[in-house]
UniProtKB/Swiss-Prot annotation:
It is found in: Cell inner membrane. It is a single-pass membrane protein. Signal peptide: none annotated. The chain crosses the membrane at residues 508-528. This is Probable protein kinase UbiB. GO terms for molecular function: ATP binding; protein kinase activity. InterPro entries: ABC1_dom (IPR004147), Kinase-like_dom_sf (IPR011009), UbiB (IPR010232), UbiB_bact (IPR045308), UbiB_kinase (IPR050154). The active site is at residue 287. GO terms for cellular component: plasma membrane.
Length: 545
């Protein structure tokens, strides 16, 4: 480790010990060096004994800074790693940090765009509207048309900090399999790698701009979700310019109720937006926490959402979508055999998995869920239970499914916060069944034909020539095969002749040797000579084949 990494590691250890997180060290023989190290650092007491372990972990991550805050947020979705009480506390982590100087933000924007700010913008506000660990936002107006906008700027020098902490996380991840009995199954390096990819993606605002443009296109003229316009002419890797929007934070229940918002419709539309993104578009906003979702002031009786911050998105391929939809329907029909078979068929678990054992494990974990009324069953926790059970059967980490699970938990939590009686299954089931129906049977065949018609119409004039070329190739192939077959037959004949000559030569040589041993004078040498000539001739023929 470098001196800088050692200093950072000591700071992390000191913060963890001051929150009593040495309790997380398992009391097994392999961890005695860590427990002994705790005794050596006796001057760092636990100053938060009155708080629960989960709360202490959350506070420690907040003290370590933005990189660790985001890491904790990601870990909150991996409930196979922690007990529910700890995972719930990690989900409360807030990514809020002090803003950096507005003059520095102006300088960064001007450097990125290659000119004075006033060339493109008016009324630039140097005080940040919002600030997070990766970037902060300033308000302004477009000079060309007076449109209100926000300018998002990546924090200066954030990349070296992220890379340094990620390197340290990888080193710590290498220790986990050695210190925890179940450490290898948890795949700590994959967890860190997934987090690293998420962070690096968030640092590229051109990627976020492209994501927002795609989502805006998907929900053009939608009555459920509004995506602000992106002004791509002014976007760079570290600067993003988008339309400024106004709305009520979705978590501000009092404000929503004060304007008589239709809460039931709003909650149901949140579910519809999520499933539309996942199954219709295969492209979903994967960071739908309350800070990124607003509700329009307009038409409270017919409310719609406004989404921001598209740095993290997810996508599912066609097979994943089908297996996921069938999994949900099979689960709510309590067909655990079908759930187990779908996991194997999809490749989510190894093909040699014992389906009977897997079915029993799913039944054991999931059957108690149905003791509750259907309206109280958590979709997100259903998915979570399924994945946690599957991981015991060596289910590989599926980043797209982890993102989906996290997003579903957000959507469901928001929906029930808005309207506690929300029956998510009742809202989602018609959508899933309709989508599955569209993927199989006559509608799917007709759609596939429609998609292929332009291609075949383009290729139709070429069809006679293609058929002729194919027949000619077939004819030439037949001639080549016949020539090759004849050549192979000739080679086989030569090989048999050579083997025969080798055998004859060896026999004559052996006979001559025996005659020589019996005391005969000239005859043995005749046999030996003939055998040697025959053997050499056969060998030469064999070498030429």
């Amino acid at each position: 480790m470098t001196p800088g990494e050692l200093r950072r590691l000591y700071l992390i250890i000191r913060v963890f010990l001051s929150y009593g997180l040495d309790e997380l060290i398992p009391r097994i023989r392999l961890t005695w060096p860590l427990r002994f190290g705790r005794y050596l650092l006796f001057w760092i007491p636990n100053r938060h004994k009155d708080k629960s372990l989960g709360e202490r972990l959350r506070l420690a991550l907040q003290e370590l800074g933005p990189v660790w805050i985001k890491f904790g947020q990601m870990l909150s979705t991996r409930r196979d790693l922690f007990p529910p009480a700890i995972a719930d506390q990690l989900a409360l982590l807030q990514d809020r940090v002090a803003s950096f100087d507005g003059a520095l933000a102006r300088q960064y924007i001007e450097t990125a765009l290659g000119g004075a700010l006033e060339t493109w913008f008016d009324d630039f506000e140097p005080i940040a509207l919002a600030s997070a660990s990766i970037a902060q936002v300033h308000t302004a107006r477009l000079k060309e048309n007076g449109q209100e906008i926000v300018i998002k700027v990546i924090r200066p020098d954030i990349l070296p900090i992220i890379k340094a902490d990620i390197r340290l996380m990888y080193r710590l991840a290498n220790w986990v399999p050695m210190l925890l009995p179940d450490g290898r199954r948890l795949r700590p390096r994959e967890v860190v790698r997934e987090y690293e990819k998420t962070l690096i993606d968030e640092l590229n605002l051109l990627r976020e701009a492209a994501n927002a443009i795609q989502l805006r296109r998907n929900f053009e003229n939608s009555s459920t979700l509004y995506v602000p316009e992106i002004y791509s002419d002014y976007c760079r890797e570290n600067v993003l310019v988008m339309e400024r929007v106004y709305g009520i934070p979705v978590s501000d229940i009092e404000a929503l109720e004060a304007q008589n918002t239709n809460m039931r419709l709003l909650a149901e539309r949140g579910v519809q937006v999520f499933f539309t993104q996942v199954f219709r578009d295969s492209f979903f906003h994967a960071d739908m926490h309350p800070g990124n979702i607003f509700v329009s002031y307009e038409h409270p009786e017919d409310p719609f959402y406004i989404g921001i911050d598209y740095g993290i998105v997810g996508s599912l391929n066609k097979d994943d979508k089908r297996y996921l939809a069938e999994n949900f329907i099979a689960f709510f029909n309590r067909d655990y055999r079908k759930v187990a078979e779908l996991h194997v068929d999809s490749g989510w678990v190894p093909s040699d998995t014992n389906v009977e054992d897997f079915e029993f494990a799913i039944r054991t974990v999931c059957e108690p869920i149905f003791e509750k009324p259907l309206a109280e069953i958590s979709f997100g926790h259903v998915l979570l239970n399924l994945f946690n059970t599957a991981r015991r059967f060596n289910m590989a980490v599926q980043p797209q499914l982890v993102l989906l699970q996290k997003t579903l938990l957000y959507v469901e939590g928001l929906g029930r916060q808005l309207y506690p009686q929300l029956d998510l299954w009742k809202t989602a089931k018609p959508f899933l069944e309709e989508w599955l129906h569209s993927q199989v049977g006559l509608p799917a065949v007709i759609r596939a034909l429609k998609e292929k018609v332009p291609y075949w119409a383009e290729k139709l004039p070429e069809l006679p020539e293609l058929v002729y070329d194919s027949l000619q190739q077939h004819k030439h192939l037949q001639v080549s095969i016949e020539k090759l077959s004849g050549h192979l037959r000739g080679q086989q004949i030569k090989q048999r002749q050579s083997q025969y000559l080798l055998g004859v030569g060896a026999t004559l040589f052996l006979c001559g040797s025996l005659f020589l041993l019996s005391g005969l004078a000239n005859i043995p040498w005749l046999f030996i000579g003939a055998g040697t000539v025959s053997w050499l001739f056969g060998w030469c023929r064999l070498c030429k084949i």
